[in-house]
């Protein structure tokens, strides 16, 4: 036996000659097999190189393949370094050729990209211009709207100032009040009345006349010689002196909104029916004063359909009778002889006490149940007065007041009766 190094491992036997021959044959076979192996390796490397070249340059012409015999002889003569030399040489030349079109493509792409970039700024400029123009338009619209709104506000304030100036009445007086006139055409009437008052009274001792449209409309307002009212009818009045004129200012009462209107009178002033047949009511007064309205729950039990107005300083047109002032206390009379001015001596008051400055009247009933009752008069409308009895707080006409005095007395439902003259501020 021999190993790879040619060492003889066989035993020393008699067949030594045969072993020597075999060794020589084996050496020859080993040399030929190594040459064959090298030739086949060279063929394979040449094929790999050719395939690589064909892959890099598919259009290049492939060289004629030599026969296998020549390849084997060439490969046997070529040293083993040719394979590496070919690999180092071929890729460099072919890589240079293959990279050229790639650089061309990159340059073309860059040029196209630059063209696109040059195209976009123009579009961007157009878009910016459009946005700027739209912003300018919006700003102009806003400024126009603001000018319009300020103009309307200025117009409205000017109108309000004109209305306020038109509502202010002329005249020099010690008492001034706000004047609210509805509709605006009534301002002419007020101006005319102011001029007439100045010419008639000379501006001495007169008070300013004011009109006021309340939520609950006052049915009438009387001024001497000049009847001013929001109703289609007028009241006949007379004037015999300079100081008999009075003004009326009605104010709503916030405590009781369903009580009738109460007019204040002086202690010697009582309303009386006009005997001339005109149907109007004339009130006689001596001096102005401030009267108040009873706003108690007991006074609300009557008819209670007229709104309440609290008197600040209220007087109607008055007539001064002939004679001295001492006769004023006895010069008044009602058509109903049973009703007399003043109050009964036994009338009791609750709440804050009596109000002697109210227009009190009293009457004595007839019959078995007749008694003396007292009440406060007030003007119900232009042609009628009513009386609020102190015993029950009922609103009734003079005839009903007389009949009420003749009826049997029934205690009021609440303990707060007989407080018709009490006022709550």
Curated annotation (Swiss-Prot):
Induction: By jasmonate.
InterPro entries per the UniProt record, alphabetical: Ninja_fam, TDBD
Region (Necessary and sufficient for the interaction with the JAZ proteins): 322-425
Keyword Transcription regulation part of the UniProt annotation: yes
Compositionally biased region (Polar residues): 146-158, 185-197, 288-299
Keyword Repressor tagged: yes
GO BP term, pick one: jasmonic acid mediated signaling pathway
Keywords: Jasmonic acid signaling pathway, Nucleus, Plant defense, Repressor, Transcription, Transcription regulation
Effect of residue 9 to A: Loss of interaction with TOPLESS, but no effect on the interaction with TIFY10A/JAZ1
Region named Necessary and sufficient for the interaction with TOPLESS: 7-17
Record localization: Nucleus
GO annotations of cellular component type: nucleus
Low complexity bias spans: 20-34, 66-81
Bias-annotated ranges (Basic and acidic residues): 37-54, 124-140
Record note on quaternary structure: Component of a complex at least composed of TOPLESS, TPR2, TPR3, TIFY4B/PPD2, MYC3/ATR2 and TIFY3B/JAZ12. Interacts (via C-terminus) with TIFY10A/JAZ1; TIFY10B/JAZ2; TIFY6B/JAZ3; TIFY6A/JAZ4; TIFY11A/JAZ5; TIFY11B/JAZ6; TIFY7/JAZ9; TIFY9/JAZ10; TIFY3A/JAZ11; TIFY3B/JAZ12; TIFY4A/PPD1; TIFY4B/PPD2 and TIFY8 (via TIFY domain). Interacts with TOPLESS. Interacts with PAT1H1.
Family: Belongs to the Ninja family.
Role description: Acts as a transcriptional repressor. Negative regulator of jasmonate responses. Connects the JAZ proteins and the non-JAZ protein TIFY8 with the TOPLESS corepressors.
Miscellaneous information on this protein: Unlike the JAZ proteins, the stability of AFPH2/NINJA is unaffected by jasmonate.
Protein name, entry field: AFP homolog 2
Species: Arabidopsis thaliana (Mouse-ear cress)
Gene coding for it: AFPH2
């Amino acid at each position: 036996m021999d190993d790879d190094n040619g060492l003889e491992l066989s035993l020393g036997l008699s067949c030594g000659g045969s072993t020597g021959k075999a060794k020589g044959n084996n050496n020859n076979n080993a040399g030929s097999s190594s040459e064959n192996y090298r030739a086949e390796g060279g063929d394979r490397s040449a094929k790999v190189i050719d395939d690589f070249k064909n892959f890099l340059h598919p259009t290049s012409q492939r060289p004629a393949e030599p026969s296998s015999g020549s390849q084997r002889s060439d490969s046997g003569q070529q040293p083993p370094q040719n394979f590496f030399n070919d690999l180092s040489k071929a890729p460099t030349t072919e890589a240079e050729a293959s990279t050229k079109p790639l650089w061309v493509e990159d340059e073309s792409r860059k040029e196209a990209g630059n063209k696109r970039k040059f195209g976009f700024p123009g579009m961007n400029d157009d878009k910016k211009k459009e946005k700027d123009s739209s912003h300018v338009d919006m700003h102009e619209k806003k400024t126009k709207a603001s000018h319009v709104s300020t103009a309307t506000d200025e117009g409205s304030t000017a109108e309000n100032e004109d209305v306020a100036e038109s509502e202010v009445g002329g005249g020099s007086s010690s008492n001034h009040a706000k004047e609210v006139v509805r509709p605006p055409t009534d301002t002419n009437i007020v101006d005319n009345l102011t001029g007439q008052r100045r010419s008639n009274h000379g501006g001495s001792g007169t008070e300013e006349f004011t009109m006021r449209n309340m939520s609950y409309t006052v049915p009438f307002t009387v001024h001497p010689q000049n009847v001013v009212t929001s109703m289609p009818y007028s009241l006949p009045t007379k004037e015999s002196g300079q100081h008999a004129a009075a003004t009326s200012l009605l104010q709503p009462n916030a405590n009781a909104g369903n009580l009738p209107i109460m007019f204040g009178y002086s202690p010697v002033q009582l309303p009386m029916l006009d005997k001339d047949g005109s149907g109007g009511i004339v009130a006689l007064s001596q001096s102005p004063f401030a009267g108040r309205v009873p706003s108690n729950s007991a006074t609300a039990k009557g008819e209670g359909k007229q709104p309440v107005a609290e008197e600040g300083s209220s007087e109607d047109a008055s007539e001064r009778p002939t004679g001295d002032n001492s006769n004023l206390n006895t010069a008044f009379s009602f058509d109903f002889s049973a009703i007399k001015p003043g109050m009964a001596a036994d009338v009791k008051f609750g709440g804050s006490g009596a109000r002697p400055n109210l227009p009190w009247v009293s009457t004595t009933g007839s019959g078995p149940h007749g008694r003396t009752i007292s009440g406060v008069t007030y003007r119900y409308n232009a042609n009628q007065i009513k009386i609020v009895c102190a015993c029950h707080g009922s609103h009734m006409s003079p005839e009903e007041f007389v009949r009420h005095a003749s009826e049997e007395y029934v205690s009021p439902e609440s303990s707060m009766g007989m407080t018709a003259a009490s006022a709550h501020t």
